[in-house]
From Swiss-Prot:
Keyword Hydrolase: yes
GO molecular function terms listed in the Swiss-Prot or TrEMBL record: magnesium ion binding; phosphoribosyl-AMP cyclohydrolase activity; zinc ion binding
Function, in words: Catalyzes the hydrolysis of the adenine ring of phosphoribosyl-AMP.
Residues noted as binding Zn(2+) in the record, renumbered to the chain: C75, C91, C98
Binding site for Mg(2+): D74, D76, D78
Keywords: Amino-acid biosynthesis, Cytoplasm, Histidine biosynthesis, Hydrolase, Magnesium, Metal-binding, Zinc
Record's keyword annotation contains Cytoplasm: yes
The name this protein goes by in its record: Phosphoribosyl-AMP cyclohydrolase
A GO CC annotation given for this chain: cytoplasm
Main location: cytoplasm
PANTHER family: HISTIDINE BIOSYNTHESIS BIFUNCTIONAL PROTEIN, HISTIDINE BIOSYNTHESIS BIFUNCTIONAL PROTEIN HIS7
Length: 130
């Protein structure tokens, strides 16, 4: 059976990335055809930045890399799931996961954010020179 990803109108597939050991969701990103091919060829996670309109290898700026342990696709082949060995933080904010805020539903349609697992593993200002 062939892997034939179905890219959206922008040429992207959604990628969910989890820690191969803990199962924690680390991040959700996007891949274009080139990012997908480079990920398969190198065993390192490559993504496509919609905001920068550019291909990027996870960790090329921060050193916080992802080695792919397993790649899966969903039933429609329009999304992929990477199980990775995360070295350092996955989030550009310096946190282990991009999902470091819990949404507490306050009733009456209201909600608020509460920080969980919010410790920083690195200082993004120092790493990215922002």
């Amino acid at each position: 059976m062939a892997f034939l990803p179905k890219f959206d109108s922008a040429g992207l597939v959604t990628c969910v990335t989890t820690d191969a050991v803990s199962g924690d969701v680390l991040m959700v990103a996007h891949m274009n055809d080139e990012a997908l091919r480079k990920t398969i060829a190198t065993g390192e996670a490559w993504y496509f930045s919609r905001s920068r309109n550019a291909l990027w290898r996870k960790g090329e700026s921060s050193g916080q890399t992802q080695r792919v342990v397993e790649m899966r696709t969903d039933c429609d082949q329009d999304a992929v799931w990477l199980r990775v060995e995360q070295r350092g933080a996955a989030c550009h904010t310096g946190r282990h996961s991009c999902f470091y805020r819990k949404v507490e539903m306050a009733g009456e349609g209201g909600a608020r954010l509460v920080f969980v697992d919010a410790d920083r593993l690195f200082d993004p200002a120092a790493v990215y020179r922002k």
